[in-house]
């Protein structure tokens, strides 16, 4: 039996972080957490690309462009979609979630979903470092692990299958 998994060594990895300005009180804290996680685990400043966008819906376009460039080992998308009085919350939350899932099914580069979908600003702030940890930091850990898993799958599974069969 072969077990393949990633690890948390970020040295040499190139990571993009897409973060909206909308709900900046929350998203800036998510970004701080993500950058802290990446740097603590060895991803250097020169290998981190932060892309600031207006809102979460613009992440879909931005993710597609970053995937087309193909220079990153993983991409993190952050955001905070907070329920309001209209149906807009549902549209934004559903569309960004569907887009990330679709890109993950069709791309070779892992995209990590770090978009908070909450009922209140307080819930969002709690998940951005106030009480419940920082989901940006957690997204950084997932990005590093998935980037390393991607490399290992190529090396340990693909190469051994193509050489051995």
Swiss-Prot record:
CDD domains: Lumazine_synthase-I
One Gene Ontology term from the biological process aspect of the record: riboflavin biosynthetic process
Entry's Gene Ontology molecular function annotations: 6,7-dimethyl-8-ribityllumazine synthase activity
Organism expressing this protein natively: Thermotoga maritima (strain ATCC 43589 / DSM 3109 / JCM 10099 / NBRC 100826 / MSB8)
Function: Catalyzes the formation of 6,7-dimethyl-8-ribityllumazine by condensation of 5-amino-6-(D-ribitylamino)uracil with 3,4-dihydroxy-2-butanone 4-phosphate. This is the penultimate step in the biosynthesis of riboflavin.
EC number(s) recorded for this UniProt protein: 2.5.1.78
Name under which the protein is recorded: 6,7-dimethyl-8-ribityllumazine synthase
Residue positions of the active site: 88
Residues where (2S)-2-hydroxy-3-oxobutyl phosphate binds: 85-86, 127
Protein family (similarity comment): Belongs to the DMRL synthase family.
């Amino acid at each position: 039996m072969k077990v393949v998994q990633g690890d948390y060594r970020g040295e040499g990895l190139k990571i993009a972080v897409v973060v909206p300005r909308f709900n900046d009180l929350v998203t800036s804290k998510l970004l701080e957490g993500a950058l802290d996680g990446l740097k603590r685990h060895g991803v250097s400043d020169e290998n981190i690309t932060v892309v600031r966008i207006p809102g979460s819906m613009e992440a879909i376009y931005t993710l597609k462009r970053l995937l087309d460039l193909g220079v990153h080992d993983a991409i993190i998308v952050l955001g905070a979609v907070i329920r309001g009085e209209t149906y807009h919350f549902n549209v934004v939350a559903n569309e960004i979630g569907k887009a990330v899932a679709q890109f993950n099914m069709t791309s070779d580069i892992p995209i990590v979903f770090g978009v908070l979908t909450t009922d209140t600003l307080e819930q969002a702030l709690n998940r951005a470092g106030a009480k419940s940890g920082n989901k940006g930091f957690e997204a950084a850990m997932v990005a590093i692990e998935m980037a390393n898993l991607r490399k290992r799958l190529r090396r340990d599974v693909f190469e051994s299958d193509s050489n051995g069969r």
